[in-house]
């Protein structure tokens, strides 16, 4: 928690005054992926209270998968848009997370299959929940597949453009050769 606070503060201090055309606020949005490391709401709220104190809370456009998958609790009172990722394996899982108050769903057309991703996207759309694509460290050709899906999704609230998480270049030594 303390490391997360300090990292958020360091990033916020570096970019808080930079303006961009891609958000409605003109500010750089923060996309935090906790990968299930917050064991409960109280602990997560300590991070978000800190974010509010330093002026960073309003910049958090997504807080992805803050809790372990088995932690099923109403999150509608959390002052940031929580995104389900690893906990939304299926359309049934996505419905459950939406009912718990999650405000976005990560689609993974490569990992969750295209057909399941489209089912999840349809359900989320019907319930007014935005989706975005995440790449699960896929290779360059598969990133293009995700771009194809992402291009058909509405922008996340507060954004003027779509969002696609892509981190394969950080995990493949020969990324440039694979292009």
Residue ranges of each PLM-predicted region?
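Flexible C-terminal active-site loop/helix
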Residues: 137-179
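Catalytic core of soluble alpha/beta enzymes
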Residues: 1-137, 141-143
């Amino acid at each position: 928690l303390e490391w997360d606070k300090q990292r958020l503060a360091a990033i916020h201090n570096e970019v808080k005054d930079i303006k961009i055309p891609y958000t409605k606020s003109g500010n750089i949005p923060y996309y935090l992926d906790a990968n299930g490391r917050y064991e409960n709401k109280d602990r997560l709220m300590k991070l978000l209270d800190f974010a509010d104190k330093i002026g960073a809370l309003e910049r958090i456009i997504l807080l992805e998968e803050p809790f372990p998958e088995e932690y099923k609790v109403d999150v509608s009172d959390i002052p940031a848009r929580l995104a389900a990722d690893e906990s939304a394996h299926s359309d049934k899982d996505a419905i459950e997370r939406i009912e718990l108050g999650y405000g976005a769903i990560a689609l993974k057309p490569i990992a969750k299959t295209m057909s399941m991703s489209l089912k999840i996207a349809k359900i989320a759309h019907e319930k007014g929940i935005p989706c975005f694509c995440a790449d699960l460290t896929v290779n360059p050709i598969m990133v293009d597949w995700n771009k194809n899906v992402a291009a058909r999704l509405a922008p996340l609230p507060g954004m003027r453009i779509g969002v696609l998480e892509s981190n394969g270049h950080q995990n493949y030594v020969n990324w440039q050769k694979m292009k």
